[in-house]
Amino acid sequence: MDGSGERSLPEPGSQSSAASDDIEIVVNVGGVRQVLYGDLLSQYPETRLAELINCLAGGYDTIFSLCDDYDPGKREFYFDRDPDAFKCVIEVYYFGEVHMKKGICPICFKNEMDFWKVDLKFLDDCCKSHLSEKREELEEIARRVQLILDDLGVDAAEGRWRRCQKCVWKFLEKPESSCPARVVAVLSFLLILVSSVVMCMGTIPELQVLDAEGNRVEHPTLENVETACIGWFTLEYLLRLFSSPNKLHFALSFMNIVDVLAILPFYVSLTLTHLGARMMELTNVQQAVQALRIMRIARIFKLARHSSGLQTLTYALKRSFKELGLLLMYLAVGIFVFSALGYTMEQSHPETLFKSIPQSFWWAIITMTTVGYGDIYPKTTLGKLNAAISFLCGVIAIALPIHPIINNFVRYYNKQRVLETAAKHELELMELNSSSGGEGKTGGSRSDLDNLPPEPAGKEAPSCSSRLKLSHSDTFIPLLTEEKHHRTRLQSCK
């Protein structure tokens, strides 16, 4: 102990037995001073703070391998780290677990825990979920950046056919890559609308004509327009298929299955009509053709390829399966109960419209969904009361899952916008680093610190003001592991 009676650290290089569990450890993290005790830190001897207890025995080399600076006069260790995250990390010594405060980036907090050598197993489960979500976002950003770099890069070792495939794939799948690609995307979008309008107009009796057998068929002009649209869709699908990097994954993806369903009925109908005319079975073939024509409505789903809003809505519905399942179950129970009550209460009326409970299902469905066609309605007082209650229950049942579905839609839509912005920002940073050489960034990384020359032997203990080190932090997260390689690729693609 010193003259004031306080417990303190021994001088660096000494082998005093005072470096024990009852000494004080004074740390200054980002300007925030904290006094810790050895008996508290020794609970987890593998952590960085616990290593400070006996670090003075190894001299200044050991001290500066653990901290950024050390003031021998104040016996104070300095760390250029986040003080808010540090306050959360030291909770492990008091409570045996770590909780991450709101407003701290989960990835940055994970890096702080790695710096202080606190295992992630001490992080509470609620905080681990935030960390996992942020990791997934960074992986998605890295994937998007990698895709953009792959589109920009041209490998000289690739053959001409492979380079042609990549150009066609980029031309069809990346409308923002060039002005002609954007024009083709707009043209495809307009043709989808035209084909859908033609399909609807073909059912108008005034626009139909009589064939040789006296049957009403679509006007030849509408058929020609539809044939042209189908030809474009077929060409587009084949080009996508031949230029796709993974043809099996391409063929099994949802949007490409929709493309097949949009064009397949046309060719099947054409084939059946031709074969039916030759086999004198035109009546049966026409029935098959009419059944296949209904599949043409699948082409409207092709709009989802050109609409991020429709894709977001699809994702929101997929994430809301639980809420939608609860809605259907609630409606099913209500339909069964109110249809049975309605049938029972209406049996006293001589002109009842409720002939059976299964027939009453229809009335319960249109009542609970607030449609109310009026083809079946109650005539007794109890039946009308039952109808009013079923109506109110239907309104409540339909309104309950709306809020979670909207939340899922807004959350996913905002997340996609953030990921797109982050990917573009990452590319801008990589381009800036490549133009500046990537080695002269302000505030060096950990690799910059590792390349610093070691302290000369026999040098006097530096003070807090005399020892200057690069200010650094681990808050920068490289999204791609081979950052220098990607910077080089980006520079070569200019």
From Swiss-Prot:
GO MF term set: potassium channel regulator activity; voltage-gated potassium channel activity
One GO term (biological process): protein homooligomerization
The record ties this protein, via InterPro entries, to: Ion_trans_dom, K_chnl_volt-dep_Kv, K_chnl_volt-dep_Kv5/Kv9, KCNF1-like_BTB_POZ, SKP1/BTB/POZ_sf, T1-type_BTB, VG_K_chnl, Volt_channel_dom_sf
Q: Which residues lie on this side of the membrane: Cytoplasmic?
A: 1-183, 245-249, 311-324, 407-494
Q: Which domain of life is it from?
A: Eukaryota
Which residue ranges does UniProt annotate as crossing the membrane? 184-204, 224-244, 250-270, 290-310, 325-345, 386-406
- Predominant localisation class: membrane
Ranges where the record places region Disordered: 433-469
| Subunit record text | Heterotetramer with KCNB1 or KCNB2.
Q: Which family does it belong to?
A: Belongs to the potassium channel family. F (TC 1.A.1.2) subfamily. Kv5.1/KCNF1 sub-subfamily.
Q: What is this protein called?
A: Voltage-gated potassium channel regulatory subunit KCNF1
Q: Where does this protein come from, organism-wise?
A: Homo sapiens
